Amino acid sequence: MPQPLKARRLGEADADAIADFMRTIGQDVDATRESVLRWLRTTAAQNPFQPGVGPPTVGVFVGSKLVACLTSIPTRLWNGTELADAHWIKGFWVLEDHRGGLIGYLLLKEMLKHVGLAASMPAALEPRGLSVALGMRDLGAVRNYIEPLRIARILRRIDWQLLKLNGVSKRASIALKFAKIPLIAYAAQGLITVCFAALRFPSALAARGLTTQLQERLPNEADLDSLWARTRSVVSSCATRSAAYLQWRYELGANGRYQFASCWRGPELVGLAVMQNPERLDDPRLAGLVIGSVVDLILDPSCPGAVSSLLVAARRWARSRNHDALLLTMSQRGLRVPLLRAGYISMPGNIHLIVRDPGDKHGLSPNLDEWLLTRGDSWSDHL
């Protein structure tokens, strides 16, 4: 006889079941009841928006066994006028033996009982489809931008057959096949490097008088909050970039995972970029290429030179670590031209923004181009 399905919010009483689930999916092979309790309590204590309040985590049980889990991350969303408490929906896990049925639907449906204003940034088709089926709005894919650094190496390693399967024209894929020849690859690198230098020249002029710093710690709270106030004045929709958020997101428990490039106009902070080394070097999709990321980018709208200054600093950082390329995921239409002028190539995105605003009462923009969104949002800084 089939065992009953039960979806509900998880808490400390479920620590044993959560630990068993985490060991099974390989997220933490050493998970114990005690480690889960520490995780739940620490997550609540470190909540920068509602200290002491744990964000909802829900699960689906088959009988007494936890077979699916979905977590959330607290945030605040800006609508151009005010901030509202919200959650990122993140971490959609279903045990392999229980996929393909109603469990995913029940899992997300249960989560939506415990959150109001919410958003997610999934790449996989299934959670996107379930989200739309349950009333969330898919605003589309967030565009990727790639800055090639070691061009000859990229050309020689790129999989032209895979590109062909992903919609690259036959002529382009044939050209890329020939570009694998070393002499042609290095000649192409020289030509592309010269073209990028010419593209960047006007931006370099705009950046005169600005200074940049590369550090392992964020600037001070007052400077960060001042930059955030200026940034949001021209943005219609985004997640918060307050000092409290940035410290919680990129410093607390990050163990040096991120590097920070700050841009200054005299004593005033006019821009911040957050960079990250690749999490793994064995991803078969990357053909052995080492790709760093600019996971967040915050800019003073009164200083157009800040973006080029920060991207120069990010480029130097990436070259010092022998990265083959830099990836930046950015939704904001107004940054497309500056990014192209900085030598970034626009690519189709794989991460979608999905929003839930019950009754549309918060007035968030339905136009993805008007959002300020990066991979740093929703903890999506992975390839």
Cite the ranges covered by each PLM segment.
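A conserved beta-strand-loop-helix scaffold within acyl/acetyltransferase catalytic domains
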Residues: 5-92, 210-297
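Short, amphipathic alpha-helical segments
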Residues: 83, 101-105, 121-125
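Mid-sequence acidic-hydrophobic segments that form the walls
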Residues: 73, 92-95, 110-124, 133-134
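A general structural signal for short secondary-structure junctions and capping/turn motifs
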Residues: 50, 109-112, 252-253, 317-319
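Conserved acetyl-CoA-binding loop-helix of GNAT-fold acetyltransferases
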Residues: 94-113, 304-316
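Active-site/acyl-donor-binding loops of N-acyltransferases
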Residues: 2, 117-198, 249-252, 259, ...
